[in-house]
Amino acid sequence: MTWQHVEAPTPTQQEANWLLQRPVVERVFGAPDPGNPQGRERYEATFSRGYLAHASISPSCGLALYKDTKLTVWTHCQGVYPLRAALSKILKLDPSSIIVHHVQGSGCYGHNGADDAAADAAIIAMQKPGQPIRVRWRREEEFIYEPKTPAMVVKVRALLDDAGKPVDWTQEIWSPTHNLRPGAGGNLLGALALPDPPPEPPPNDVPEANGGGGTRNGEPLYDIPAKRMLHHLVTESPVRTSALRGLGAMPNVFAMECCIDDLAARAGKDPVEYRLSIMTDPRARGVIEKAAAMAKWQAGAPGGQGRGRGIAFARYKNKAAYSAVVIELSVDEEIRLHHVWCAVDAGLVVNPDGVINQVEGGIIQSASWVLKEQVRFDNGVASFDWETYPVLKFSEVPEIDIELINTKDEIPLGVGEVTAGPTAAAIGNAVSHALGARIRDLPLTRERIMAALLKE
């Protein structure tokens, strides 16, 4: 597979700088920017994250059978109906002649190679009527060819009042699309080999009504009088990009909550106290207070000695479940997580065990993203196995305590992606507490730890 019309970043090109130079589609949300006519104190910071892989434990697989003018497909993809629509388009079959069965497989965590493997099987099956066709990608193929989650750059600008509280907040976001799932026939690798492939879809992202893609959780829930998002939808990428657990929420919350800790330090306030001082939502306050109590949070606890604690909060999409996370860790040459405390308010909890499983899974996966994961490029994708794309090991998983605030009078809220952002930011804040230095680029590698210490 050869990609055309894009300039792939090499190891000497940092993704953040590369993204800032790409063509974009501009979108603006929120209050107009008044500038700074009152000459208020100004805060600015920039954060970045590289491309990530879904890193499913098993490569993608699909099975197809074309018999008696009917196409039957078995797949572990996340959307059987969008896949059917895409197959109908590329194979020029009526949708009523296609049946797509969902079967259990390794977790997708978004849009990985499962749709592509199913499409590969379907395309071959159309040439071999009556013959079942099974396609299973190799590990290398999965890492190289599956859609990646986009690299992102997030810049935060805040104007502060005399008490050090934000009165104006701008979150500026650069990101390729998080929304190239199959549907109208686009974004299936196998379709590119057909005589009449579908046209490339126009640049788009998840609508704000559905939580946004690159802008997801880009607006603070805190009581800030004026808030806005500037979204630069990057229209070029060296690899296909699409959905991964949480979409843009993790880098947006990472940036936002690290900034909140920085503002607390500038104001001479404890991070928990500062958050509560700018938050009136009772359910948000509830999870912040609960997580702090679970961890026996001590205001003013000394840091900078290689061991630290951090806290972070978010309400996923600003309309799903609330969560706050406290993390204790140590930093030597690398970061070691010791304990995670998490409080979640998901409304009426119907299946507590299922909720806890989702919350724990989100914490572990987010920790892996923050500490280890990044797709590397060297004249193409250079991350193709577990050695070149390491993930968190079982031996590196910390002790995790979860407490559900079962607000039985409230409707149930989704929890599958609620802890990705707060976990990432809590790690970032704990590292800052342990080192006395802020690292704003993910993952938090040994090289970045050393660079931050030398800079300080």
Where are these regions (language model features)?
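Cofactor-binding beta-sheet edge motifs in enzyme active sites
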Residues: 1-456
